[in-house]
Amino acid sequence: MLVLSKLFMNFYIFRLPLWILMAAIMDFENLLQILVTSIVQGITEFLPISSSGHLIFINELFSWKDINLTLIVAAHLGTLFAVTNYFWEDCKKYFLLGPLEIFSKKKTFNFNLFLNLFYSSIPIIIFGAFLKFYKINYIYHSWLIACSAIIFSLLLFFSDKNKTKKKLNDISFKDSFIIGIFQIFALIPGSSRAGVCITAARFLGFNRICAVKYSMYLSIPAISGATFLMFFDIIKQNSFFLWIEVISVFFLSFLFAYFTISFFLKLLKKINFNFFVIYRILVAIFFLIYLDFF
């Protein structure tokens, strides 16, 4: 499970010449955008605080013209590798061994969870493909992002007050499909994919750790699908400098995402989601004030 993370840590600690090369061939703003995108995406992807909202806000703060799609794809790939590496044993059971039981008479928890993850993924796959096919652009209006952050933070707050009795082995088709419907709201910038999935699971009575784990498992098909759709938009680009950026963002986002997952799961044993609710609301208010004055 730790093989990739140790390999990547060794790469970044001892391969300083690559950083020197990057600094030499890139201007400061480009290098800054790479670092910020990697760190923000890695830290925020699996927390209920919206990675897209943070990236857009930082874009406004630094007056960058737009979010570099290539960097976003690389960052998503990094976080995808982080969650699959961290939960490698679970991924083998649920995504590799689980589907093989489809022809078996005796179904285990592995197959049931795989099936429920599949059910949860259907709504956003269909809706996301629909938007992509008809070339419907997402609405990235700054006010919408701030307002959705506040609204979905409050929903998380109220869901966290719910009684918690269910564990992952209690999940039903109805539960998984409801979580899948909620995940469609993740297409609204500022809502947070992790946040809406956790909110739905908490409303359904799952404890915090199980809600977060299910959200992280569900991120694997969700991020894979989103990255697959975006990948074709950048595949035709062929540049040495571009690939240096892609590799750097991938490794950095992997590292930050991996350690964020570990820290988040340990932290949840001691606290509830109120910290994240307050943080998101304060950031949204600051964002609204910033938009008014600047």
Language-model segments: residues:
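Multi-pass membrane proteins that catalyze or facilitate reactions on polyprenyl-/lipid-phosphate substrates
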Residues: 3-294
